[in-house]
UniProtKB/Swiss-Prot annotation:
It comes from Pectobacterium carotovorum subsp. carotovorum (strain PC1). It is found in: Cytoplasm. Transmembrane segments: none annotated. HAMAP family: Rel_fac_2. One of its GO terms (cellular component) is cytoplasm. InterPro entries: PCRF (IPR005139), Pep_chain_release_fac_I (IPR000352), Pep_chain_release_fac_I_sf (IPR045853), PrfB (IPR004374). PANTHER family: CLASS I PEPTIDE CHAIN RELEASE FACTOR (PTHR43116:SF3), PEPTIDE CHAIN RELEASE FACTOR 2 (PTHR43116). It holds the Pfam family PCRF. Methylated by PrmC. Methylation increases the termination efficiency of RF2. This is Peptide chain release factor 2. Gene3D superfamilies: 3.30.160.20, 3.30.70.1660, Release factor. Signal peptide: none annotated.
Length: 365
């Protein structure tokens, strides 16, 4: 006879965790939105606006990743509970063993979805760019930079992300002086944002005829793709609208009616005014157009300031900002921030980075 209580407890635990996640991720709203997006994408004229169609396609993928996974968890847990009942009724150990295998798979799926809660930053869901820059040290450092490029490309491929090499400058003899890679996929920036920093390599250099040990540095800098399309929505509650008598030229009625309009956008302090028409309605429309234009420029300046802050942060990465050490002679790679290390150096250089990335995200770096 097999022990069923531990399995029942696991089913209960996974059901409770799944219910918490369902609420946290706002499953009902996302499911409703997914239906709306699917309906829009089924419209025959959707590709008349390619950019909007692409944005909808991306939104659908993001929504499906959550909705479909929660649906699979819900159905999977029901199926496992039924399988357990069958195993008990028929006293079938093989069927019982199947329940534990299924539970392991469901727990893994749930764990991956729970991990998404780490991605709460403003740009975590965005595509991103990864800059790799060789440090001083000539060919050895440039070869190390090319190894990092390969490592991140392999990691992205394993994650199912698409990649584009935006720019790559070859090294003098071998390797890469610098490269920029665009990584496209859900939460690309969220996954990679803690990889910014200096990567240190220690090995016997293949470029040294004496086979001596060399230390090389290359930096990685990760930054999100910030969309330039800014949708200006104005909340009427944020506006103070004053009307007053126009002054100056404007005809015989200019000072007889309060046709001039001044609009103040209280959250930003932006003010627009118009008095060039005798109609208060037309003056108000014109002032609103000006306000939208000013708010658009205001938002653009904010975006540019954010981009500049990212660039400033990039220049702050000094060679002392080491995040990971790769000592190939000793078969040891260690993250200097979290203490996570491994001796399977080749696997890491082939893109097996998740243990380091997950630890840094959980540490809130």
């Amino acid at each position: 006879m097999f022990e069923i209580n531990p399995v029942k407890n696991r089913i209960q635990d996974l059901s409770e965790r799944s219910a918490v996640l369902r609420g946290y991720l706002d499953y009902d709203a996302k499911k409703e939105r997914l239906e709306e997006v699917n309906a829009e994408l089924e419209q025959p004229d959707v590709w008349n606006e390619p950019e909007r169609a692409q944005a909808l396609g991306k939104e659908r993928s993001s929504l499906e990743a959550i909705v479909d996974t929660i649906d699979q968890l819900t159905q999977g847990l029901e199926d496992v509970a039924g399988l357990l009942e069958l195993a008990v009724e028929e006293d079938d150990e093989d069927t019982f063993n199947d329940t534990t295998v299924e539970l392991d798979a469901l727990e893994n799926k749930l764990g991956q979805l729970e991990f998404r809660r780490m991605f709460s930053g403003q740009y975590d869901s965005a595509d991103c760019y990864l800059d790799i820059q060789a440090g001083s040290g000539g060919t050895e450092a440039q070869d190390w930079a090319s190894m990092l490029v390969r490592m991140y490309l392999r990691w992205a491929e394993a994650k199912g992300f698409k990649t584009e090499i935006i720019e790559e400058s070859d090294g003098d003899v071998a390797g890469t002086k610098s490269a920029t890679i665009k990584i496209i996929g859900d939460y690309a920036f969220g996954w990679l944002r803690t990889e910014t920093g200096v990567h240190r390599l220690v090995r016997k250099s293949p470029f040294d005829s004496g086979g001596r040990r060399h230390t090389s540095f290359s930096s990685a800098f990760v930054y999100p793709e910030v969309e330039d399309d800014i949708d200006i929505e104005i909340n009427p509650a944020d506006l103070r609208i004053d009307v007053y008598r126009a002054s100056g030229a404007g005809g015989q009625h200019v000072n007889r009616t309060e046709s001039a309009v001044r609009i103040t956008h209280m959250p930003t302090g932006i003010v627009t005014q118009c008095q060039n028409d005798r109609s208060q309605h037309k003056n108000k429309d014109q002032a609103m157009k000006q306000l939208k234009a000013k708010l658009y420029e205001f938002e653009m300046q904010k975006k540019n300031a954010e981009k500049q802050a990212m660039e400033d942060n990039k220049s702050d990465i000094g060679w002392g900002s080491q995040i990971r050490s790769y000592v190939l002679d000793d078969s040891r790679i260690k993250d200097l921030r979290t203490g996570v290390e491994t001796r399977n150096t080749q696997a890491v250089l082939d893109g097996d980075l998740d243990k380091f990335i997950e630890a840094s995200l959980k540490a809130g770096l």
